[in-house]
Regions:
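Conserved glycosyltransferase catalytic-site signature
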Residues: 5, 41, 80, 98-100
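Acidic catalytic patch
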Residues: 14, 38-43, 71-91
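Short, well-structured N-terminal submotif of metal-dependent ribonuclease cores
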Residues: 1-39, 52-62, 133-134
Length: 134
């Protein structure tokens, strides 16, 4: 099951509406309660871009390091095949690049995405799990 940036960024954003859900899900991953969880390295890029755009360079280093060290979370690198699939998803379903990278990564694995983003429901073959109920 892929988790994407909507479960990573709330740890960084103060007062984010998904803060408690994010903490619970990431805690379950760390403690081994949720298994088989992975994320695309594109999620780390999103975190870096979000912090960079706010002038938070040191925080970007700290955040990426913390996520990199999160136990029981596998990081899946972008490959040329995943990038090609993402480009097709962008064209066919009108989603943004990062969502397309996440979708393509999930489709290359088990086709399951845990997210609150409704965009994934437009992509055939994906199963979307709501983190509020996992």
């Amino acid at each position: 099951m892929l988790i994407e940036s909507d479960l990573l960024l709330p740890i960084i954003k103060k007062g984010d509406r998904l803060g408690a859900v994010s903490e619970r899900v990431l805690g379950q991953i760390k403690d081994g309660g949720l298994t088989g969880v992975y994320a695309s390295t594109a999620a780390l890029q999103e975190v870096v871009f979000w912090l960079y755009n706010r002038g938070l360079r040191q925080e970007a280093i700290q955040a990426v390091n913390a996520f990199k060290l999160l136990r029981n979370l596998e990081w899946v690198p972008l490959s040329p095949d995943i990038c090609l699939q993402a480009a097709i998803i962008i064209k066919e379903y009108g989603v943004g690049p990062f969502d397309a990278y996440h979708a393509a990564t999930a489709l290359s694995r088990d086709s399951v995405v845990m997210s609150t983003e409704h965009v994934y429901g437009r992509i055939p073959g994906l199963t979307v799990l709501d983190p509020h109920v996992v």
